[in-house]
Amino acid sequence: MEKTLAELVREYKGGNEKSFEKIAEKMNPMIMFYAGKLYTWEQEDARQEMLLTLFCSLKKMKYCKSEGECLSYIRTAVRRRYKDLVLKELHNQNKTVHTE
C-alpha cells in the first residue's frame, strides 16, 4: 500500500531523506503547474525553484497531523513563492521600462 503524504512527511522529518523523493513525486503536478506559469523562466530552472520551495517548506514544517494539513502547508508555501517570484519579475520589468 502506498504511503500517504502525511506519513511520508513524518518519515522525512524523522530523518528519512529518501522520503523527499516520494514527496516530490506526489507533489509533482502542483510543482509543474506553478513552474509552468513562470513564463520568463527556463522550465527546468522554474521546476528546481519550486522543488527548493518544497524542500524548505518541509524543513520549516513543525508538525503534520493529517493529509490535508500537510498538503495545505506545502501548497501555501509553493503558491507564496510563486507569487513572490512573479512580483519580483514585474518589479524588474518596471525598472527596465523606467530606465530606458
In which residue ranges do the predicted regions lie?
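Cytosolic regulatory regions built on CNB/CRP/Popeye-like sensor folds
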Residues: 1-2, 7-10, 60, 66
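Charged, low-complexity intrinsically disordered terminal regions and linker tails
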Residues: 2, 96-100
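A short, charge-rich alpha-helical start-of-domain segment used by transcription regulators
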Residues: 2-3, 10-33
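Conserved RNAP core-binding helix
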Residues: 25, 29, 40-60
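Conserved interaction-surface patches within small, structured recognition/assembly domains
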Residues: 34-38
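Short, aromatic/basic-enriched loop-to-helix "N-cap" motif that marks the start
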Residues: 43-44, 59-77
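Arg/Lys-rich amphipathic alpha helix in sigma70-family domain 2
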Residues: 79-96
